[in-house]
Every structure is written in C-alpha cells, then in structure tokens.
C-alpha cells in the first residue's frame, strides 16, 4: 500500500462467540490509528466458518463496540462504499479470485478424502510442497480427469501452491522484517468443500477490494501472513502494511486462556466487564497501555487523548501480562471522576438487583459517602451493605480494640438522645454525640467507635456522622440496641 494512500483499517472479528478482551484491544488500536490519521475504521464480519457460527455473536460484537464508544465508519449496519461487510454475502468475489489463482498456477484443486488426509497427517504431517505429489489433486491428475471429477460433483477444495525452498519476507510495523521459510508452510486450503472460502482467501481479497491500508491484528496471525503475502504476489496486488500486536498474557506469564482467566477472576469477554461494573473509558485506557507506551509517566488517558498520542512505533512486540489490580486502579480514578448523580444512576441497577428499595435522594447520599472508597460501581452495594440492611456480625478486631466496659452504657445513652431528635441529619447526630461526650466527660471517640461498630459492623468506613444520617434514625437506634445485646 502506497505510503500516501488514505488510511483505512478494519476490525474483522469472526462471530463464533462473544467478543474477547483481546479482540477489543485490537479494535481499539485500529480505531486509534484511524482517528490519528483522519482515516476510516471499518467493521467487517468474517463469518465464513458457518460450522462455528454462533447466533447472537455479531450482536455481542456490536454491543461491545457501542458500549466502549469505538464507533466505526463503515460496517454491516450502516453500509458504505465497499458493502456488503459480511463475508458470507461476498462469496462471488472469493470464487473469482480463487479461480484466478488456479489459472495462474498458484493454487490447485485437491480431491483427497478425509481418510487420505488423516493418513497423510499421520505419516508426513503436512500437505505441502514435499507431499502434494503423492495426493489426488490437479497437480497429479490430468486436466481431463480434473474436469470430469468437478463435473460429476466430486468434493474438492482449492489449495494454495506454496513454492518450495524460498524465503518470504514480511515487513511488520512493530517487529520489523520477519522471514519465513516456505518449506515450513503448508498448502493452505483457500476454498473448502462446501464452497466457502477460508479466512486466508477471504481476508486478502476483502482487504484489497476494500482498500485497507494497514492490517493491525494479533500476533497469532503472524504465522499466516507469509501465505497472505504469497497470494498478494500471485494476484499482482500490493499488500497492506502489517502490524501484529503482542499477546496478552496471564499474570502467571502464559497466554491468557479462558481457563486461566476464570481461575484468576479475570473476565474474558468484553460485556462481562460491563456486568462487573467497570467503566468503558477505564477499560479502554487500561487496554491501550497493554502493549503501547505513550512515552511518558502518564497512565490516565481519555479516548481523544489516546488518539492524539498513539503510534504503532511505540507498540512493543513482547507479550504483556494482564494485571487485574491495575485495571481496578485505573477504574477507581474514573469512578471518582463521576458526579454523585452519575454514580447513583450507575449504581441503581445493582441496588435493585440486590433487592433493596432506596430513594434517589438516599442513594445519592450513600454514593457521596462511599465514592472515594470503591473501585467499581457495584461496590456501592457489595462493600457497603450496612447502608441497606442490619449487619449480621461485628468485626472481631474492631470489637477487641474499640468495645470496652463503658461502650454499652454510652451507646444506649446516645440511642436515647437520638430517639428524641426531630431532624436526623449529619449536624444533629454530631451535636448529640458531642454533647453526650461532654456530659459523660469522655472523649468523642468513646462513642464514635462503638456507634460505627453497632451501625455498620465494622471499625472503618466513611465519616460516622454521615454514616448514621444515611442509615436513618430508626435503623440506627435498632442497631445500637442489638449491638449492646450482642456485645454486652
């Protein structure tokens, strides 16, 4: 692709399952590169593998991109100059160019049965330049026999004819020049027996016809790239620029598999992060730094700031470990930047899912108290249930440290005072506590700490007066009496 050509990149997932977190990073890097260079970001659905097609997967992909704000310029829904954008709707293109490869002597028909292929795999390993002459294909059969078999409806595939003992050079924007020995490359199937193209053929045909300038994808596709380069050469096309992103590794160092992720509590699928209460901006911020370095110490970037700073030459080639604690740290900053109203709105579904009925005003009060103490929105509920229900137990270390022989009497006296107040707000509960402390000639802490334990079951949390006011008069008094009964 000429260096002065307009930048056009594509995110081309297969709808064989929900969108993986690694797929979102690929989409993000494509998006950032396109926006940085005033180019086009294309969504293309690569659904040629009908056997693995999963209903709903395409909807999940679109929903994940919409949730994270990665808006594409062209795609199956909005169309574009290069429509259609589902490969299952573009089959005529693939058959046309597969035939051209055959006519050019760069691909061939193969009629081998599954049994013959299995025998080949067991004896020789690969269908390639050293073994294809032993098989039933258009290289070993006469033209008449090939035509006859096709006319009779025999099953066949079309395979790429990989040259023997050559070196294929792949120029990668991240890794530099990568060389591949063709003796280690198999004769890839390009068209399957059901007539559907494989990823490899459909991929290069669509990238060419859609004028894709840069192919930015995961490292797992690097080993396939020499096959693609051979096809570009055979068809007389200039290949796009390639950039293969580093693997996302588990915290233990290996490739982040679904099993490892589940064991480590790392969500695998993008929409699971929404369910877990992560902010989409935080997730993108975290993923951007999972392979790319901005060249500064700064770690928090809005999407437009990432666009301004992003470049492929600052993307590393080595795998990067997924650090869930780091993601939570990033998310914490985004949660703290929310307005209290926005946090309450985001928390509302989690509150209701937990079965709590809370007014808007009270929920906003609670959110204001806990906002700087949580990392993800659901923790408004999960880490602070004492706002919504009486504690079932009392923190042992807190009781040992904060509850003494005077605590019960002081707490009951405080409960009596609270019983008589009309306005149950922060100022009132503080005034009553400090007046009682003066009356009893004790420090305020002698009442504050038992009150916190009684009302929340903990020795830590938001300011005690805000806590009491948010829990409410009736609940506070009830909890204080229950604590005295339980702790003596």
Swiss-Prot record:
Motif ('HIGH' region): 13-23
One annotated GO biological process: glutamyl-tRNA aminoacylation
Superkingdom to which the source organism belongs: Bacteria
Residue ranges annotated as motif 'KMSKS' region: 255-259
Transmembrane segments annotated in the record for this chain: none
Catalytic activity: tRNA(Glu) + L-glutamate + ATP = L-glutamyl-tRNA(Glu) + AMP + diphosphate
Quaternary organization: Monomer.
CDD domains named among the record's database cross-references: GluRS_core (cd00808)
Cell compartments where the protein resides: Cytoplasm
Protein's recorded name: Glutamate--tRNA ligase
Job of this protein: Catalyzes the attachment of glutamate to tRNA(Glu) in a two-step reaction: glutamate is first activated by ATP to form Glu-AMP and then transferred to the acceptor end of tRNA(Glu).
Gene3D superfamilies, alphabetized: 1.10.10.350, Glutamate-tRNA synthetase, class I, anticodon-binding domain 1, HUPs
Principal cellular location given in the protein's record: cytoplasm
This protein's UniProt keywords: Aminoacyl-tRNA synthetase, ATP-binding, Cytoplasm, Ligase, Nucleotide-binding, Protein biosynthesis
GO molecular function: ATP binding; glutamate-tRNA ligase activity; tRNA binding; zinc ion binding
EC number: 6.1.1.17
GO cellular component: cytosol
Organism: Salinibacter ruber (strain DSM 13855 / M31)
Family: Belongs to the class-I aminoacyl-tRNA synthetase family. Glutamate--tRNA ligase type 1 subfamily.
Keyword Aminoacyl-tRNA synthetase annotated: yes
């Amino acid at each position: 692709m000429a260096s002065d050509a307009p930048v056009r990149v594509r995110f081309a997932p297969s709808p064989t399952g929900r969108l993986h977190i690694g797929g979102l990073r690929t989409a993000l890097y494509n998006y950032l590169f396109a926006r940085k260079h005033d180019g086009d970001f294309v969504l293309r659905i690569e659904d040629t593998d009908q056997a693995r097609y999963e209903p709903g997967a395409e909807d999940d992909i679109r929903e994940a991109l919409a949730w994270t704000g990665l808006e594409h310029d062209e795609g199956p829904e909005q169309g574009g100059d290069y429509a259609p954008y589902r490969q299952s709707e573009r089959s005529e293109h693939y058959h046309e160019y597969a035939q051209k490869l055959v006519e050019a002597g760069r691909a061939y028909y193969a009629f081998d049965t599954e049994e013959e292929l299995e025998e080949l795999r067991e004896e020789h390993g690969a269908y390639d330049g050293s073994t294809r002459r032993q098989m039933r294909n258009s290289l070993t059969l006469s033209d008449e026999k090939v035509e006859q078999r096709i006319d009779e409806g025999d099953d066949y595939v079309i395979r790429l004819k990989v040259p023997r003992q050559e070196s294929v050079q792949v120029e990668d924007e991240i890794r530099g020049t990568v060389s591949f020995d063709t003796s280690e490359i198999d004769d890839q199937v390009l068209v399957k027996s059901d007539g559907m193209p494989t990823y490899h053929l459909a991929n290069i045909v669509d990238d060419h016809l859609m004028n894709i300038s840069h192919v930015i994808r995961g490292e797992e596709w690097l080993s396939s790239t020499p096959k693609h380069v051979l096809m570009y050469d055979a068809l007389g096309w200039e290949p796009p620029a390639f950039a293969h992103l580093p693997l996302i590794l588990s915290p233990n160092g290996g490739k982040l598999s679904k099993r490892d992720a589940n064991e480590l509590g790392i969500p695998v699928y993008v929409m699971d992060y929404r369910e877990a209460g992560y902010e989409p901006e935080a997730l993108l911020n975290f993923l951007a730094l999972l392979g790319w370095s901005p060249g500064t110490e700064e770690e928090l970037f809005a999407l437009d700031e990432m666009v301004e700073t992003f470049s492929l030459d600052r993307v590393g080639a080595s795998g990067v470990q997924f650090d869930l604690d780091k993601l939570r740290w990033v998310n914490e900053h985004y949660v703290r930047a929310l307005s209290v109203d926005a946090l309450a709105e985001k928390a509302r579904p989690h509150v209701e899912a937990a079965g709590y009925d809370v007014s808007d005003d009270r929920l906003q009060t609670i959110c204001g108290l806990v906002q700087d103490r949580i990392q993800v929105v659901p923790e408004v509920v999960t880490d602070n249930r004492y706002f919504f229900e009486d504690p079932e137990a009392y923190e042992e270390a807190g009781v040992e440290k904060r509850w003494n022989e005077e605590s019960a009497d002081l707490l009951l006296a405080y409960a009596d005072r609270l019983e008589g107040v009309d306005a149950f707000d922060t100022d009132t509960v503080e005034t009553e506590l400090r007046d009682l402390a003066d009356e009893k000639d004790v420090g305020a802490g002698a009442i504050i700490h038992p009150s916190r334990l009684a009302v929340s079951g903990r020795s830590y949390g938001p300011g005690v007066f805000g806590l009491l006011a948010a829990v409410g008069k009736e609940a506070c008094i009830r909890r204080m009496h229950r604590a005295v009964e339980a702790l003596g």
